[in-house]
């Protein structure tokens, strides 16, 4: 079972993500990042690739797309906050853009 990150595990899992542009979501235990692409097609392609991984891992993002931008919010609703699944999906999403 996935658990909410403890104070001891948050730093090692989240600090590398903060270095790549992820940030804490204001007012809740979640992380957020906005990706910017050349155009809508690239943005939608990213969402399609990310959706395949999200479905495979049964961990689905809150996200929105406006033209060439995709804003992603990750939190694990079952545990009421950020878990290792969020860090895993964030790393995968970052990898899909490189």
Swiss-Prot record:
Name of the protein this chain belongs to: Putative pterin-4-alpha-carbinolamine dehydratase
GO molecular function terms noted in the UniProt entry: 4-alpha-hydroxytetrahydrobiopterin dehydratase activity
Keyword terms: Lyase
InterPro entries xrefs: PCD_sf, Pterin_deHydtase
Family, per entry: Belongs to the pterin-4-alpha-carbinolamine dehydratase family.
E.C. code: 4.2.1.96
Gene3D superfamilies: Transcriptional coactivator/pterin dehydratase
GO biological process assignments: tetrahydrobiopterin biosynthetic process
Organism: Ruegeria sp. (strain TM1040) (Silicibacter sp.)
NCBIfam families for this protein: PRK00823.1-3
Catalytic reaction equation(s): (4aS,6R)-4a-hydroxy-L-erythro-5,6,7,8-tetrahydrobiopterin = (6R)-L-erythro-6,7-dihydrobiopterin + H2O
EC category: lyase
Residue ranges that the Swiss-Prot or TrEMBL entry lists as coiled coil: none
